[in-house]
């Protein structure tokens, strides 16, 4: 495949959220080998970073000409390097200047693609505007650099948060090949989170995606996923199990499966022992107890804090069933780690005091103060199970609710520094499109338990049994919770009973399995997806008129030129019929000059608490006023033009309009101190859907 410039867009570039960050960061060097260090550009969001978070971005002007080309762009762009192995070229997008155009942008996507953004909120708008901004920046790069050099390009967008770039470029730069990759589906993740049906994948064909997306309040995100899957040149996902999900929920079967690689990361016995000791010390600080290193095993579960989807519930349930069994095994004990980032504050003061030798106190279960401990699922389940970490108990649980990135004042180690110290990784996922956490465990030589509901679980099951791979795959599809918990309990006991030599054999098997996941073994799948995307872009390129493939320049506008912005209507050749030239336009009432102040009055909600002003609009057409829920903008647009002309000739009405307009101007230009009233909702007018209950009505009444 000839080298093409590869733009890769993700919300997780320089922004660790979940497994996609690992996917992209771990294969940078393989990508650079194929596209060249200067042919790969990662694009991520310019998001605020809390103080103390490890920096992932370093400013670096790797192309001064590009900086110059983007300096006047409406999208803010930071140029630099992503601080992962390979340090790829990186652009961070600041989409804040697009906020004012949000409705226009979303409206255009609705008109062209049927993208339903009606029920979106800012957790939807912000990523969509980021991706749209990324598309605008790529369009500028295409115009200034790629077209003159006749250079082909590929854009791969990960997840719905990046998909708007594909939609923009389909029109703005159709010769660029596009790949959309979903690492999970929004609707699938939400459906699974209810844990309602153990036959999740078998029952997908009976799901109505639109109905369920609306019921679960993910309709806009689901719509973006569906549209992107439909419109991209190549649609990909990470596993066969997720491909099945995509087919039923998004309406298109993925063209290529892109398994996630990682490779082996074997550690020396000394480093493993050091990591194990750090985990013991952290547990002792948390519980205040002491552990016999020879009789205690360390279990670990890590990942996103998706309580049901990640199998946290069944993990704790199975562990809670072990005390009697452990007591009968010569006093063996287990420490059950749950490394799941949650809303947290500082390390618990009592634990901090213990670390500095100044306090004992009762045992703890969580290393940090939680923002909402009352509603924390792990805390509540531990309470229900009676796990209190009392001294000497066979089962202790330690919840670590932070990102282990080495910046915490108490836990200075990173996740990958601590992971090798675990004896067993336990990942009994209910929903797991791939499953990086068991793969990471295996890569560091830690035996693991996963399930047939994980893409990695299904892949590794095809490589052999537990003794060959180091991984046990539990059945979860079609199995009820109690049976899964019992099976996991039995699997844990079998591991606990293994002689030390057998556990060492499993570690060696893990490393061999991890070697199979080296990115060099999986990049062929990416090459296939990119080949298809380039072919699709090349086919469209042949169909484009030459002026679309020329470096655009701003034409001189005149009434005869037929020019509209950057797009110029070419004159028809002699003997030819000119092609139709279409433009979107809006039909709206033009107010008579005498009534112009009504437009300004309508634009200021001041009229809402002045009944005599509201009556100006009501007198225009009382029936229409009520029908439109007292919406003055809609009224002025929809009332018959003849009625507006009649009112313009009514001297008394015009005088009243002028008087009240002057009153509004005077009242809004007072020099008195201003008061800003902040509230989440306001009940101001029926057509303004900004309230949901009594709080909004109260706020509106105050105004």
Q: Which residues fall in each region the model found?
A:
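Catalytic cores of nucleotide-sugar-dependent glycosyltransferases that transfer UDP/GDP/TDP-activated
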Residues: 1-703
């Amino acid at each position: 495949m000839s080298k093409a410039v590869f733009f890769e867009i993700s919300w997780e570039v320089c922004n660790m959220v979940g497994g996609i960050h690992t996917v992209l960061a771990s294969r940078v060097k393989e990508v650079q080998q194929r596209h060249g260090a200067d042919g790969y550009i990662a694009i991520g969001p310019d998001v605020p970073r809390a103080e103390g978070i490890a920096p992932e971005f370093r400013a670096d002007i790797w192309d001064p000409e590009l900086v110059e080309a983007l300096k006047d762009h409406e999208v803010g762009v930071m140029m630099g390097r992503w601080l992962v192995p390979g340090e790829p070229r990186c652009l961070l997008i600041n989409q804040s200047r697009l906020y004012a155009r949000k409705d226009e942008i979303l409206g255009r996507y609705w008109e062209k693609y049927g993208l339903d953004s009606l029920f979106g909120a800012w957790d939807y708008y912000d990523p969509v505007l980021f991706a749209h901004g990324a598309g605008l920046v790529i369009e500028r790069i295409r115009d200034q650099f790629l077209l003159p050099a006749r250079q082909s390009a590929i854009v791969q967008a990960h997840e719905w948060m990046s998909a708007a770039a594909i939609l923009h470029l389909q029109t703005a730069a159709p010769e660029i090949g596009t790949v959309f990759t979903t690492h999970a589906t929004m609707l699938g993740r939400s459906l699974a989170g209810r844990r309602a049906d153990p036959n999740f994948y078998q029952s997908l064909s009976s799901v109505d995606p639109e109905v369920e997306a609306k019921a679960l309040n993910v309709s806009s995100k689901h719509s973006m996923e569906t549209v992107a899957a439909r419109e991209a040149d190549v649609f990909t996902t990470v596993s066969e199990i997720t491909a099945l999900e995509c087919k039923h929920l998004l309406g298109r079967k993925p063209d290529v499966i892109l398994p996630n690689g990682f490779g082996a990361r074997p550690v020396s016995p000394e480093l493993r022992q050091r990591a194990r000791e750090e985990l013991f010390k952290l547990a002792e600080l948390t519980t205040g107890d002491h552990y016999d290193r020879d009789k205690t095993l360390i279990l670990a579960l890590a990942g996103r804090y998706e309580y049901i989807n990640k199998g946290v519930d069944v993990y704790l349930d199975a562990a809670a069933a072990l005390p009697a069994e452990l007591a009968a095994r010569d006093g063996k004990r287990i420490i059950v780690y749950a490394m799941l980032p949650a809303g947290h504050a500082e390390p618990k003061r009592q634990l901090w005091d213990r670390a500095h030798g100044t306090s004992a106190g009762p045992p703890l279960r969580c290393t940090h103060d939680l923002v909402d401990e009352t509603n924390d699922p792990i805390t509540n389940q531990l309470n229900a199970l009676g796990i209190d970490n009392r001294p000497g108990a066979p089962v202790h649980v330690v919840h670590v609710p932070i990102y282990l990135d080495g910046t915490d004042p108490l836990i200075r180690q990173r996740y990958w520094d601590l992971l090798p110290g675990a004896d067993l990784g336990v990942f009994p996922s209910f929903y797991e499109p791939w499953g990086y956490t068991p793969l990471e465990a295996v890569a560091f030589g830690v035996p693991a338990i996963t399930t047939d509901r994980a893409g990695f679980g299904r892949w590794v099951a095809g490589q052999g049994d537990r003794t060959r791979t180091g991984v046990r795959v539990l059945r979860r599809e079609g199995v009820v919770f109690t049976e899964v918990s019992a099976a996991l309990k039995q699997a844990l006991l079998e591991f606990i009973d293994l002689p030390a030599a057998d556990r060492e054999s499993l570690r060696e098997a893990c490393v061999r399995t991890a070697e199979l996941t080296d990115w060099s073994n999986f990049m062929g799948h990416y090459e296939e997806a990119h080949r298809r995307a380039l072919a699709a872009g090349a086919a469209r390129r042949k169909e484009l008129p030459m002026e679309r493939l020329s470096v655009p320049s701003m034409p001189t506008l005149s009434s005869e030129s037929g020019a509209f912005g950057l797009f110029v209507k070419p004159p028809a050749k002699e003997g030819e019929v000119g092609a139709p030239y279409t433009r979107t336009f809006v039909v709206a009432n033009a107010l008579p000059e005498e009534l112009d102040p009504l437009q300004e009055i309508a634009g200021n909600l001041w009229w809402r608490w002045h009944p005599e002003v509201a009556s100006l609009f009501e007198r225009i057409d009382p029936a229409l006023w009520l029908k439109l829920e007292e919406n003055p903008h809609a009224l002025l647009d929809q009332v018959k033009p003849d009625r507006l002309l009649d009112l313009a000739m009514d001297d008394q009405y015009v005088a009243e309009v002028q008087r009240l307009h002057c009153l509004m101007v005077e009242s809004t230009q007072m020099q008195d101190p201003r008061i800003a009233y902040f509230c989440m909702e306001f009940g101001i007018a029926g057509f303004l859907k900004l309230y949901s209950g009594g709080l909004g009505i109260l706020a509106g009444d105050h105004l």
